[in-house]
């Protein structure tokens, strides 16, 4: 039985705790022993993205201290996972602990497919679903194939969803376009961010999606707020919630 430490991002902890609980339930159903280290804090991504490396470094050190004893760390966020794997080198000196946590930290769907070896989940979810492929997971973790690459298309997240009975993945005009959130980008470039988000929502609505899902609560939150203001006929749910509900 794999022993898995949950790393829960700030958005999930503060605003969407149901996503963390769904992640734990799904992993337990797949035979994992799930633990939650209570000393964990933010991964430091907001500070690093804003250019405050000195403020991000203590949080990166804390992450290494908390999680270096675990062989598997699972996070329901592509962007936070990518922060650990791809950007801690610029904040911390090289060490065995740093290298270990980089190797052992996985996004949820990535862990299910690549580590547990699960390609298909037994479950049912009778809805039309649109998949939003967030930028960090797609382009920094390789959860899918970006359209700008001349390579066979594929998506680990879409593969898991497509195997669920009754779940229909809708076809989008632009399947991997950014939603416009981008953390501080949504604050400093609010107008552009909102226009990008509305474009993504319109693509999903036109395709007939009842529910939009993805690996990052931040992107889903951004689009959900825009959709509710315009009363667009679509809901937003993290992929962990859909997979946990489908396999219940």
Locations of regions flagged by a protein language model:
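Iron-sulfur cluster-binding electron-transfer modules in prokaryotic oxidoreductases
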Residues: 1-248
């Amino acid at each position: 039985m794999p022993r898995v430490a949950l790393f829960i991002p700030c958005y999930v902890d503060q605003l969407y705790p149901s996503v963390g609980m769904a992640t734990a339930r799904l992993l337990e159903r797949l035979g994992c022993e799930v633990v939650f280290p209570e000393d964990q804090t933010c991964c430091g991504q907001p500070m690093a993205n804003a250019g405050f490396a000195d403020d991000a470094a203590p949080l990166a050190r804390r992450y290494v201290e908390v999680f270096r004893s675990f062989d598997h760390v699972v996070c329901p966020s592509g962007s936070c996972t990518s922060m650990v794997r791809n950007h801690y080198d610029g904040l911390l000196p090289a060490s065995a602990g740093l290298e270990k946590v980089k190797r052992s930290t996985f996004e949820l769907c990535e862990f299910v497919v690549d580590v547990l070896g699960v390609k298909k989940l037994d479950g049912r979810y009778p809805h039309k679903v649109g998949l939003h492929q967030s930028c960090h997971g797609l382009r920094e973790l390789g959860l899918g194939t970006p359209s700008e690459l001349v390579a066979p298309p594929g998506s680990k997240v879409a593969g898991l969803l497509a195997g669920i009975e009754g779940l229909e993945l809708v076809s989008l005009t632009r399947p991997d376009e950014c939603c416009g959130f981008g953390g501080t980008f949504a604050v400093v470039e609010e107008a552009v961010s909102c226009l990008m988000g509305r474009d993504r929502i319109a693509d999903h609505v036109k395709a007939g999606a009842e529910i939009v899902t993805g690996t990052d609560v931040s992107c889903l939150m951004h689009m959900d707020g825009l959709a509710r203001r315009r009363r667009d006929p679509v809901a937003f749910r993290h992929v962990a919630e859909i997979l946990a509900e489908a396999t219940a």
